[in-house]
Amino acid sequence: MGEGGSAGLAEVGLAVDDVPGTAALLVRRGLDVEGDVVSITGVRWRLTEARSDEEVSSPPSPLTLDHVVVSATDATRAAADYGARLGLDLRLDRDTGFGFRGMFFRCGDAIVEVVVRREGDRRDAFGGLAWRSADLPAERDRLVEAGVEVSEIRAGRKPGTVVATVRDRDLRVPTLLVGPA
């Protein structure tokens, strides 16, 4: 369960080289940190020790995290919190033409996409996950064969991509699969 009792994504892990050192730095930057959890206007990020590829014992996954979506209502505060305070690299800030502003922050191999729909003082919230697949048609077929409801593949908003939406109610997190066109 998410904060406030809502179902869905409760927190996302951020791999860092030094959890205590990073936590102390984020406190100095004015963020709310309790132990290894950083809270940004209702969104919880858990600091975890980064591991090298050699330390990971599981086989490679056909899916890798492409981006985490955060919905926000104040673009200036979001830029300050996710960029200057948390230290993510703001790569793109634009009006999407779809009724919201998109702010894209680089975070390791993934992106934190902050979607700003309107100004206000509502708390931020996780809006979903997008997973990258080198072979989206095969991944979609695998999921459908496993009984997961997945939309047809369609053109993505980012040029050169295709996407499919996972519509599994048990997942409770809006989920998108992204692949090359």
Predicted regions and their residues:
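Conserved donor-binding loop and adjoining core beta-sheet/short helix segment
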Residues: 1-10, 157, 164
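N-terminal beta-strand motif that seeds the catalytic metal site of vicinal oxygen chelate
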Residues: 5-16, 46-79, 85, 126-131
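Vicinal oxygen chelate
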Residues: 20-64, 94, 98-116, 144-181
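Conserved active-site tyrosine of GNAT-family acetyltransferases
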Residues: 26, 78-83, 143
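Acidic/His-leaning functional-site neighborhoods
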Residues: 103-132, 139-140
